[in-house]
């Protein structure tokens, strides 16, 4: 792609990226409020789980959330800048060292737990309090 085309694409993407989501990474437990359309009605459905992967690619960014529902592992990939995402709330900050947590697919029960990153949680809480003041 030529430099002109790349600059046009970059300008278009920056105009499309309007929503600010909270900072989260792999290992964090998040609640994603998703807009669901049923017939003529539209409602908001909460999807809570652990972020196991993120893909940072500008407008094409996405993240994968995994949860256990009735004993079965369920994963859902969300486009970060999608219109169906109403909001994202970070419940817990996880302390992990791997970039992608695909190994959680093979674990179950207590083995699939992730330690909480208390330092990051305290820093986030302090930032929220400073923002309100």
Curated annotation (Swiss-Prot):
One BP annotation, GO: translation
Signal peptide start and end residues: none
Keywords, in A-Z order: Ribonucleoprotein, Ribosomal protein
Entry-linked Pfam families: Ribosomal_L19 (PF01245)
InterPro entries associated with the record: Ribosomal_bL19, Ribosomal_bL19_CS, Ribosomal_bL19_sf, Translation_prot_SH3-like_sf
GO cellular component: cytosolic large ribosomal subunit
Any one GO molecular-function label of the UniProt entry: structural constituent of ribosome
Tagged with keyword Ribosomal protein: yes
Function, in words: This protein is located at the 30S-50S ribosomal subunit interface and may play a role in the structure and function of the aminoacyl-tRNA binding site.
The protein, known as: Large ribosomal subunit protein bL19
């Amino acid at each position: 792609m030529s430099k002109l085309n790349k600059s046009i694409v970059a300008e278009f993407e920056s105009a499309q990226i309007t929503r600010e989501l909270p900072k989260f990474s792999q290992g964090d437990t998040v609640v994603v409020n998703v807009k669901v359309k049923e017939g003529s009605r539209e409602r908001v459905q909460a999807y809570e789980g652990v972020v196991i992967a993120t893909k940072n690619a500008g407008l094409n960014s996405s993240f994968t959330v995994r949860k256990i529902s009735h004993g079965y592992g369920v994963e859902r990939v969300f486009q970060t800048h999608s219109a169906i995402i109403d909001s994202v709330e970070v419940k817990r900050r996880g302390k992990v060292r791997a970039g992608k947590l695909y190994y959680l697919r093979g674990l179950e029960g207590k083995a699939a737990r992730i330690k909480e990153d208390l330092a990051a949680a305290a820093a986030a809480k302090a930032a929220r309090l400073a923002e309100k003041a």
